[in-house]
């Protein structure tokens, strides 16, 4: 597309352009006409952009107003989609007005039938009277459509609709349910609709118009997940056809058909931050936009020592003012703390590189790495590893997995209350989900509920009794919250396999652990296979042959398999594996159909003891299980301790497996891969992968006493109390749990039975000792929970850490420990704590923007710069130019054009000047008379000049002459002496002394330019000539200022304060603005512009001899190369005024500019707050003029404002472009001239500085960075007073 656009830009022939425009219009016109059918409304620009994203066009000329027109256009578009899908035969429409037929593209010939029930009063005026019915009538058509009402139905109502109408095969239905409401999040499309959450429900507000809102219950959101609806009489399949914002179109058909497993509503663009602080509620918990998260991450890592205030300012900069209401203050605090933490971690890889090592060091590097990793386990991870762990962001999604539902009367409340559908209390969630999916009769459950009416889990008592749990009493945690023995309930489909033993299936059904089909994650299996093949993980596996390793990896490369699984989650001591072990004890000794895979040898020994009737070959550690044949039923015990990806890889290579039983605890520790190079180290814990396939979490324990279990938030099924003691000494005969491998190994060497906090998972013992040291606060809550839940009767804490305030405060912040330690903490001696002097108060920063690393900003400009001679202009005669100077990369960004640079001088002459003859110039001048007339007439009208010529005023002429002479005499004596030659009467009045202008090129678009461009010439005329025509220009300027309309601002003899006032008073920021980027403005001012100047001078009655002299100078001007073509030269007296007036004349000749459009002009610079159309007459003369303009449009939104004379025109007033300001300051600092210009820079920068927080609405991120750097440089240079100055015409800030 870029090449096509470039090709079109190169077309300059007006006739060709006219043909192209006509052709384009022929395509645009029918599209605009068609868009009015579904979207006839005048839509706000932001909402129109959102609709366009969904493929809905908005006619920019539409004027029809609607309170929520954008949402109406979505409804109409979905109706069109429905009409496209419906057959031409008659159909029945439910809850739809007959007037909507036009959006369905259907008419009376289709003989459609409308059936509407008056459910609420406004339905009586919404639907036509002849379509209203008292009750449902029979549906006699194959197809029907229900409009925006299905979410108010129950599932049974829908099933009955199909059951009682056998002719109905397909039902199309639209729903209005925002998927983000499942999480109580703000609207994901705020330009279309908003959401309120209150009164135990949510209110959908289209177009922010409360009068058109709809109130919903959270229960209604179930419809977004329905995959199949089953009843004893029939089955229905749901498929989502379209989704636009909160509006969704579903197709419902009879029978069980395939429907996509996942429903996607929007792109995943949010992340969840890892929980790195304890307790968990002190971490960011809400999804955060990933783009903003990456911006914050790169910011805190690009700035040296960013402060808390800097990060707050950065977040304020990134979040639009209109979006601030979507964030909670406490969430912002947690996000800031998260980024403060990672900003202090080192992001430089602290491990050895292999490129600089000799061969013997490379051979020893793996050993060194292993030792280093072991040491890190003992002493804590390095800062680099901590940073990587802290950056494990989890993608947040609004997508949903479909769920199958049943409408049987005994199962009407079996909907899954998962983590995405928030409820007020967990007690409500359990009672709603405590349904009849259990192998018991309704009568038994009703009796259980009757006997225990006040227990939220009463319907689950029989399931709990099957686990030998008598949960008829309420228990509470330390915060007095009710502990629920059943949690995390998921409703899942039930599947069977004919080869599963009947007694095992009966057992699983009794426990409500029926198998369900689980798809294997190919990515996890492939990661594990790659790690095994490349010897990154494992011990036994590394000893396998290369062929075996290659074969193993190949088998895990691409898997498409689903396996029946029974996932059993429960607390430690809940009896997760007890029932399985009981069943296995009934098996024949030689039964090889069952294999138990264990993560540790200790756990394997425990199983062989508890199931002695089976041969030991049935019990395998996980690595041996990969190398040996296994049965068709697999039990993965404590599967969270298995390596990530192991289960998927195992099931991929063992195709004979028909059932996998997984037991684990999501609250306990999980496997951690120590090799960071392993792919599996980046995978999610297996417990998170399979938790959605667990029917419920059994939150009970037979191991721990109530006082211990309740402190852990677990329901205890035992009686008695637990003994807690603490001392600095270990007791004999009790295993010790230590937080680090180092302590565990040392204790083992001394003959003491010891395990780590994480490694004790699966252990059950009468008494246990828990070692507390400086590593304890570093342990995760899962690890602490594992350690605390091991003991039956007694826990002894061994405090080997410092007995100081800081140490105890750290332990208090560790989840679970604080509750226990309060019971047993020893009396501490009063400590004398030295009172530190309070730090000196830090003065509040003047700027509201976050700190920026200047090196990073500069680097973005210099890193792509080629070497000096690759950028310079080369001439075979004079060699390379010398515009790139010094070795300073900052200075090299700015070309320095110097008068003594011969190569640049000749390159400038070649690019800027064109020689001809005086005869050709006169011919050009006379041939362009008509165009000059047109230019002047348009200029006259634009500048409101009188109808009759302006009489000549000799006194005013004399005054202007004096002003010119006084200005000239203010030059230094040296400057006057240097110009002595041009003051001589012998100097040829037509001759021009040509010089190259010395200057630093600081235009924003030319900073760091890859190739040096031609410079600018200074044309030195005879001094008398300059004085005469400078007087003429000043004389006409006086009249121009007198007649200038209020809406036109000419930036001549004005101050920035004048310009600022004009912008604040006159400029319209509610529409796109327009600028004209002229090409070769000076060189293109040919005979037509000269004619315009002559006619303008005659209108002001300038004496004829002066006008004739001016024509002679313009047509006979000569340099040492010959006579110049008619053009504008920089050394003329009237250069600025003539350029400005030519700009105004050309702009008003080309464009239809309304009188209420604000306009600013200065030389070749201009801008208008209105996008004007081209006059038809201009197409007739455009080819006769050299002057060409390229339009530039600005939306006048954040980061896209018009620029004029180095100022940015913003809704808050004029401000200097921060990029140019900052880079100019950097240049001046690097050439040691900053002290000369700092005050003038500060006065210009003050316009932006004093806007304060309002700048967040104007600057994008890059501009904000440059603004902060410029502000800091000026303040450090002692210009704070200049930035705060109030009498500079900005505003009254007092």
Curated annotation (Swiss-Prot):
It comes from White clover mosaic virus (strain M) (WCMV). Gene3D superfamilies: P-loop containing nucleotide triphosphate hydrolases. Coiled coil: none annotated. This is RNA replication protein. ATP binds at residues 570-577. Belongs to the potexvirus/carlavirus RNA replication protein family. InterPro entries: (+)RNA_virus_helicase_core_dom (IPR027351), Alphavirus-like_MT_dom (IPR002588), DNA/RNA_pol_sf (IPR043502), P-loop_NTPase (IPR027417), RNA-dep_RNA_pol_alsuvir (IPR001788), RNA-dir_pol_PSvirus (IPR007094). Its EC number is 2.7.7.48, 3.6.4.13.
